[in-house]
Amino acid sequence: MTEVKTGRVVDDAPVNDAPENNAAEATSPARHDAIPEEARQRAAQLRADLERHNRLYYELDTPEISDAEYDALYRELVGLETRWPALRDEASPTQRVGGEVLEGLEKQAHTLRMYSLDNAFSRDEWGAFIQRMYNALPDAPSAFWCDPKMDGLALEVIYENGVFTSALTRGNGEVGEVVTAAMRTVRNLPLALRGDDVPRRIEVRGEVVIAKADFEQLNARQSAAGGKLFANPRNAAAGSVRQLDTTVTAGRPLQFLAYGVGQVVLEGGTAPWTTHSGLMARLREWGFDTPPEGRLCASPDEVWAYYEALGARRESLAIEIDGVVAKLDDTEAQEALGFTARAPRWALALKFPAMQARTRLDDIRVQVGRTGVLTPVAILEPVRVGGVEVSRATLHNEDEIRAKGLMLGDMVLVQRAGDVIPEVVRPLVEERTGDERPFVFPENCPECDSPVVRPQGEVAHRCVNVMCPAVRRQSIIHFVSKAGLDVRGVGERWVQQLVDGGHVTSPVGLFLLTKLDLMRFERMGPTSAANFVTALDAARTGATLVRLICALGIRHVGEQTARTLAANFTDLDALREADAETLQQLPDIGPEVAGSIRSFFANEGNLELLERLRAIGLWPKRQDAPPASEGADAIVLPLQGLKVLFTGSLTRVGRTEAEDMARAAGANIASSVTKSLDLLVVGGKPGSKLEKARKLGIRVMEEADFFAMLASGVASVDASEAVAEETPPSQEAAGAEDAPSQGAAHVRTASDETGSASGDDSRGAAAENDPARPARGGAMSTAEGEDVPRGRAEQLKLF
């Protein structure tokens, strides 16, 4: 297959999304120092924390920390991985785009990955980015196209022959949620493109936003109707697009602003633009609105001047923005620079400093979490910060209060950076009147009056009473939450009401509730009560070992560690018997985590809870595993230790479910095709990952064969052995013919398509003959030593 770089035919060079091939990063000297255990544990904790906050922000729209706090965690992890490169792995948040796709809406793979952007917060960091760019491409042009960085929901709208056909949220960058019906109601989205020169197929990428004035009116209507108020325009936009009832979406003041394209299929010829500014002009001609204030800057210095000027008047703009996106204007230079594992090397987000406001610190209240940690919360005189009313802010711990020198009654500086939870920056000492009072951290729990302790080496104070009402309440809420057992339809407010009323004293109590029990509560009718009971019963019978371990709330055990434990122990009995030495032999489990697990199982109250869970049938074993041998804690799994990657559109289950099944069989999930990959599982239209795997001689297995292998419990692949049955050469060639290289956006001419078109979304018999799918010559196929045949379709990579 040939690629077109801004109209010139060159040798095919698929996007290489493996981090080790990052040309810009390759200039950094390798570090081989021994990794201290503290650094290893801190990196593991940072990865778990960042993944959790990614999910809260991108998927659930309920962030718990500010952008500035997230950036600080992210940069700390980058620093550790830079200092000790062996800490970096493919699952690190620094190597990925985003988080996982929510259930509830249909999922669909993006034809081409929707990448994230790297960030800069200072002129020095902008200069460092420019230097890296010129190191990688010395003759790179100096002009950049600049847009405001909008604070909305990123998605992709797709047009066939000029007519709107579908829309996908960005999701995790590779798979998004189908929101076609909702986007059809967005008034400024063209349902048909203008002009005669529209592409045969085009994927337009942009942001769904709500203007500030429209947001105020929306919240006023919500308030008048007694509905829930939105925290900010981004949450309102994201929630509106994800509505299953499109009449609700139609009533929301949404706008779609286009900033780029994915795949483009032309009737003939080459792309009608050679610059990003030219692309933006063409998008406007086709009928799209584009971000306001977009501008072509002739040099990096001009970009910085644009950034400063826009930042000075951001409050006067009609939409919420939190920075500037600068993209190298020349598309041929973009193509030459390519991508890292998570972001383009030719674009950068220049973030604005957080928005700030003055207000009074009226009080500091202490809350108790599920692990007994006491967290101080600032109670503020309500103030608007960046268009959102702020009345509370977390202070994290006593040390932060002391370090900032806060006193009750202080005038303080508060900031937020586009998310819900703000930060108290500092007290305005110069405005003190003498009436301010020092805050004294409580010596007793505010919920149960038990003594509070601060363990040596920790910043947190803890309530040591295991029967503390707050600890019990938060533990039960966590047990059924998305971070725990993930019980759909059982809301936090109902659980809190049941616990506070004394009707439920442990997680087990929830599963013993009957429909009649629930109908005694106000606003809990027969249907709601039945749904509540059904949801809990479904969670009880369908729980996986991973989710149960997460639900138990063992300190230092997040979802990734829970997956590791579930992959190595048959059930909680086996895990309970494991000693600290056995646990520390597992990936990412050090002395602290192992000690926490052992402490959990040494607690009599926890053991009693486990027996009660067993009694109600909530006792899952490791998925697809035979019982462990007598006296053995861990078992050998079909895919134990193998690196597995999924690509293409899966038909049996979603990508997340497939990855969970592979993990349960002992596999490690990879994020890209590298030499260390053991197995690539392909669905429909697998694209560039399949082509790259063939070039590297990596084993390839079709979706149906993979699930058949899991069902049998016997692995058909071993990284140390040759493939048992290779596909006959004739079938291999037929299966590989015209497989599209989809590393980034590309343009094809319609006249070059033969057989089953790669743009065809049909299934069934058509999918069987899809030339982008591998042949069915056996359970596995490989093309070691063979070059994948090139098609004649032309490609152009665009952001």
UniProtKB/Swiss-Prot annotation:
One of its GO terms (biological process) is DNA repair. One of its GO terms (molecular function) is DNA binding. Belongs to the NAD-dependent DNA ligase family. LigA subfamily. DNA ligase that catalyzes the formation of phosphodiester linkages between 5'-phosphoryl and 3'-hydroxyl groups in double-stranded DNA using NAD as a coenzyme and as the energy source for the reaction. It is essential for DNA replication and repair of damaged DNA. The active site is at K149. Residues 634-723 form the BRCT domain. Residues 1-35, 720-799 are annotated as: Disordered. Its EC number is 6.5.1.2. Zn(2+) binds at C445, C448, C463, C468. It comes from Nitratidesulfovibrio vulgaris (strain ATCC 29579 / DSM 644 / CCUG 34227 / NCIMB 8303 / VKM B-1760 / Hildenborough) (Desulfovibrio vulgaris). Pfam families: BRCT, DNA_ligase_aden, DNA_ligase_OB, DNA_ligase_ZBD, HHH_2, Nlig-Ia. One of its GO terms (cellular component) is cytosol. It is an enzyme of class 6 (ligase). Residues 755-767 have a biased composition (Low complexity). It catalyses: NAD(+) + (deoxyribonucleotide)n-3'-hydroxyl + 5'-phospho-(deoxyribonucleotide)m = (deoxyribonucleotide)n+m + AMP + beta-nicotinamide D-nucleotide. This is DNA ligase. Keywords: DNA damage, DNA repair, DNA replication, Ligase, Magnesium, Manganese, Metal-binding, NAD, Zinc. Its cofactor is Mg(2+); Mn(2+). NAD(+) binds at D67, A68, E69, Y70, D71, S116, L117, D147, R170, E207, K327, K351. Residues 1-11, 787-799 have a biased composition (Basic and acidic residues).
